């Protein structure tokens, strides 16, 4: 299967084979479930879901919504589904602080600080049979990142304090292409979608040279770590961002 081959190639020997098998075999059904939940993806003139390419892929297999607003659309659809389920309680404007543990040492909930008009102001707790830490990245520990303002690594810290083992923390992804402003700008920076290159855009250096040619067989659509490394090399050579 080409999708599996592409994933393993981009993983450079670091992939969990079982996880890759789950990704490529269950991915299409997961997309169908998202559509059933109300997610709307961009379509071609024929009415089929429009697919494009991103780094590391040899085929067009990336679907999108509203151009480059795919994440927002998926979040919208899932949040609407959650709000429509009377069996789920949503606590908004809440900062999870620490994991709660039972007398036996098992995690059984979290302490949280809820702030905002109309909310339960102050420190409280939420009990649960299972706690899933899904807090996103930690890019905001760096002065410049394409990660949103909420990507502060709080979830990783919470897990560490609870005694969980954290793996692969060195794999902090920096998106290769960002709209440069200047060094005075801190925090979240404007991301230039990889799909732009998937539709034919090319990367040029200060000399208008297509510098990814010869660096990787897929050139501008090489895996992100390869593209990011070569962009960094070009910056070092030119002394320019």
Briefly describe each language-model feature range.
Residues 1-23:
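Glycine-rich active-site loop/strand segments that organize a redox cofactor
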């Amino acid at each position: 299967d080409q999708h599996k081959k592409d994933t393993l190639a981009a993983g450079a020997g670091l992939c969990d084979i079982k996880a890759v098998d789950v990704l490529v075999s269950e991915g299409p059904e997961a997309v169908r479930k998202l559509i059933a939940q109300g997610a709307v993806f961009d379509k071609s003139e024929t009415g089929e879901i429009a697919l494009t390419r991103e780094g590391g892929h040899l085929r067009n297999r990336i679907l999108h919504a509203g151009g480059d607003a795919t994440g927002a659309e998926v979040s919208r659809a899932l949040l609407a589904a959650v709000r429509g389920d009377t069996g789920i309680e949503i606590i908004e404007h809440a900062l999870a602080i620490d994991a709660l543990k039972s007398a036996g040492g098992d995690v059984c909930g979290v302490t949280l600080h809820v702030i905002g008009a109309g909310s339960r102001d102050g420190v409280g707790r939420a009990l649960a049979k299972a706690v899933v830490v899904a807090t996103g990245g930690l890019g905001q520990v760096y002065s410049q990142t394409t990660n949103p303002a909420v990507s502060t690594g709080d979830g990783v810290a919470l897990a560490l304090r609870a005694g969980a083992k954290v793996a692969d923390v060195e794999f902090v992804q920096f998106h290769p292409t960002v709209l440069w402003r200047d060094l005075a700008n801190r925090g979240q920076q404007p991301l230039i979608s990889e799909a732009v290159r998937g539709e034919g855009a090319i990367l040029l250096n200060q000399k208008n040279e297509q510098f990814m040619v010869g660096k990787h067989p897929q050139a501008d659509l090489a895996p992100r770590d390869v593209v990011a490394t070569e962009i960094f090399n070009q910056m070092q050579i030119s002394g320019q961002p």
